[in-house]
Amino acid sequence: MTLRRSFGFAVAGIAAAGATAAICFGDALGLVRSPAKADDSIVSARFDAPAHPIEVLQGARPWLTPVPDGPKALRGKVVVVNFWTYSCINSLRALPYLRAWSERYGSKGLDVIGVHAPEFGFEKNPANVRLATSQLRVAYPNLQDNDYTVWRAFANQGWPGIYFIDAKGKVRGYRLGEGRYDEGERLIRTLLAEAGHDVSGVPLAPIEGTGVEAQADWADLGSPEAYIGYDKAAGFASPGGFRSDAANNYAPAARLSLNQWDLAGSWKVGGEYALLDSGPGTIRFRFHARDVHLVLGGAADGKPVRFRVTIDGSAPGAGHGVDVDAAGWGEVREDRLYQLVRQSGAIADRTVAVEFSRPGVRAYVFTFG
């Protein structure tokens, strides 16, 4: 799940410090102590880098977007490896920086490599990942890591997990979670200079994400990630609780407290998602955030599923997200993250409701920003 935790930008031989990060945590763990100097202090980090990371990448399969001249061409290059998954909001908000680094330094000896390690079942489908990389303008090479082979080799722990490898093939720094991108870019420049590349003519210009990729409003973010499937669900408030793996007619709660949610209509709640089983249905969440996202899967018949978003019972108007209009209408066409709400002005506790017009839609997780 997404948490705000203090994880440093750990760097071998280069200054590092602790920072607040937003992370989608995974299950694979590796733990050693990796000292890094920061103002004459030692920063310890949960990290176990592979001794030969380039060899790990060279042996990985399949490449959805191949490395020009093949994986062997990575040897002798400065490489940034990004573990991501395309429905994770934390991964999406990191993309503007990775794109910019690839564009700025690709001709100076840098290769950015994406390692797509799926969280949900639909993210294992190569066609879905290819569509997502096209829609998200991820032009740098990407490999698909459905069985987490590369993830485990790097002892990665969450999305995004960003690793900085020097031209000699050594992991020199890593970042678990969002943030500290300025330090990441400075490290890239240092590693390129060490390898004999002149980056003095490349300006350190600001990088700004837009739309769903815009940085979160951390100061007013009071809602955590909330899974809908019973494996990780918390805050479910419909009377009677879940009826697991069976269709059930759910009723809305009389009142939702902050960070509670409910269902209305006939839903089948599984471990990973809730499936609208018949008729129209609604899901609600009481939130405190600027942005509201919901990861949704389309109907099995491939036809779009229309939905309508309301905030405290009214159309979102100017507070609509990129995937709905001012009246609140949107369509589920692909399995992905949908931005429902982007507010401006004062942020307060509010209730978002999403009503789906017909069955077949799958709801996975609410995320916020």
Feature map (PLM): residue ranges:
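Non-globular targeting/processing and membrane-anchoring segments
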Residues: 4-62, 182-369
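A short beta-strand-turn-helix
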Residues: 56-79, 102-105
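Short active-site neighborhood of thiol/selenol oxidoreductases, capturing the structured segment around
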Residues: 68-92, 98, 112
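Structural recognition of the beta-strand scaffold that forms the well-ordered cores
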Residues: 79-82, 111-115, 141-144, 164
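Structural microenvironment flanking redox-active thiols in thiol-disulfide oxidoreductases
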Residues: 92-136, 144-150, 305-307
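Thiol/disulfide oxidoreductase modules built on the thioredoxin-like
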Residues: 134-138, 144-187, 341-345
